[in-house]
Amino acid sequence: MKVIFLKDVKGKGKKGEVKNVADGYAHNFLIKQGLAVEANPTNLSALEGQKNKEKKNAVQELEQAKQLKETLEALTVELTAKSGEGGRLFGSITSKQIADKLQKDHQIKVDKRKIELNDAIRALGYTNVPVKLHPEVQATLKVHVTEQA
């Protein structure tokens, strides 16, 4: 019997797959547990519609990420911090501070985990910070740290 998997089933199939399984297994386990539905024309067309919708959403997310990249690369985030001799900071600038400043000054919400700051910023001046907006889109954000008066 052909079934469409609604959830991942270890050793049998992944969500969205159409596979042939034993009739008893399909009726008594997969369909009863809500793990699969029978692969009839109605369910197959519903699956096709769902796959098309997911593709559209993926394309839309990619476009939004590209637009956000252009916006971020045009901006400079201004932060102030106390510093000592030679422009070294007391403490450091973290990705959370950068994300908060973006939200506050420019109303752009970026998750702090997407800001790929290898080491916290510990010196005054300009720093280019990579921001991973999408698996295929990475922006570079300029961060300017000035001395606090």
Swiss-Prot record:
Pfam families: Ribosomal_L9_C, Ribosomal_L9_N. Coiled coil: none annotated. Transmembrane segments: none annotated. PROSITE patterns: RIBOSOMAL_L9. Keywords: Ribonucleoprotein, Ribosomal protein, RNA-binding, rRNA-binding. Signal peptide: none annotated. GO terms for biological process: translation. It comes from the Bacteria. GO terms for molecular function: rRNA binding; structural constituent of ribosome. InterPro entries: Ribosomal_bL9, Ribosomal_bL9/RNase_H1_N, Ribosomal_bL9_bac/chp, Ribosomal_bL9_C, Ribosomal_bL9_C_sf, Ribosomal_bL9_N, Ribosomal_bL9_N_sf. GO terms for cellular component: ribonucleoprotein complex; ribosome. HAMAP family: Ribosomal_bL9. Binds to the 23S rRNA. Belongs to the bacterial ribosomal protein bL9 family. NCBIfam families: L9. PANTHER family: 50S RIBOSOMAL PROTEIN L9. This is Large ribosomal subunit protein bL9. It comes from Bacillus pumilus (strain SAFR-032). The gene is rplI.
